[in-house]
């Protein structure tokens, strides 16, 4: 009795202690009739379910809610029509058989209608239509087992009220054996637990549960006959729960059979609650990617843009001044961690500044040439360097200034350009022995030529070295040595051919003519070789001539 805590007032049905064999024959006759009607009813409902499933597969996600509403209306109408026909036949057949328990059934519909009044108007109409028929039907003898964890499972008010009323339609039958009862109940509620999880995702599953409850009217009447009632019927909530569980079991069996035969199975997903988390996770991953990209772009901009680094350095200086004045009281550990990034940025900034100064210096050297260079030294600003100590900074500045001064001195020297090619010629390339011999021979010839040129440049012309004068002196000397008529004849000829007689020997015009005549005479008359006389002979000849 602990399982059925919701049973009202703990009423007990004393018919539980009666014999079970009285109702077995009735159960068999009812089960045969129920099976015949149930087969036809199942086929019609299966076709409707297939059509609904095809419609669900074709329609878009935006039209699902409309289709759910339409299917609810269709299922309710079909359920009302089938229940009216079914209940009228069952009530007329079983009316004379069970007159003793009609009074008990009259109390049940009143209980089931009381919670249904709180639901929609549709549930009220269903209660009114099924009221007269339920008065003639028996009550199931046994209350079904309630599985834990499914007590609070409700789809909406309409379904709970409909399922509660459908549960009263089930016929009472005998109980064949305890073994069959245990097997059926265990299978029944194991399927119900699995199907309840799969059918909780959408409203279409709840509609199918309504149809499944109609399909289960006959089979459940046979199975309920196996149970012997020991307690009075439960409250409407429990009846709705049990009816829903049994309909879910029958629905799961029908869907399994259809999924094997049909290709287009459009049953809802078993875990719909996890689907909204997927786009949220995707959006989170996309946001993380965007953040990573932004961080990469920021890091690139920090290390590539020198102007941004300058601005950062100014901000750091202002922050440091605030710290000195006592505005910032951060702990030393956090300041040290922040200084690591600042030092790297400051180092890059100072390196770029030094390179810029060197480039400016070299550009000025190329433009101005040998002129004096006046380098604009950077103004010394008292600053705090985060990468080096003050002593190291001063040492680096001194070294940079020294290097700049040396470069400026080398540029100011006038003979700087002439010394550079001399260094290149001072170290000739290494040659083979044959090339060396040729080079030495060439150098020797050049030396001899230079000496001969110097000697020729040093020679000065002598006085009286003309050709005509030399010939005259020569002939005189010969005449003095060998006085003969030939010599006189030569003299006469010379005097005859000379146009200017008695002219001075020093005249240039007579000397030119005498040269030509002397050559012709000497060539024809005598074959003497004309050679220049040494100066001593000339002097002697001149003296002799003067003496004469």
From Swiss-Prot:
Pfam families: Hmw_CFAP97 (PF13879). The keyword ATP-binding does not apply. The modification Phosphothreonine is found at residue 155. Keywords: Coiled coil, Phosphoprotein. Residues 152-161 have a biased composition (Acidic residues). Residues 85-297, 407-431, 497-548 are annotated as: Disordered. Residues 91-107 have a biased composition (Basic and acidic residues). The modification Phosphoserine is found at residues 8, 19, 160-161, 235, 259. InterPro entries: Cfap97/Hemingway, Hmw/CFAP97. It comes from the Eukaryota. Residues 383-460 form a coiled coil. Residues 214-237, 264-289, 504-514, 537-548 have a biased composition (Polar residues). Residues 238-248 have a biased composition (Basic residues). Residues 112-121, 191-209 have a biased composition (Low complexity). Belongs to the CFAP97 family. This is Cilia- and flagella-associated protein 97. The lineage of its organism: Eukaryota, Metazoa, Chordata, Craniata, Vertebrata. The gene is Cfap97.
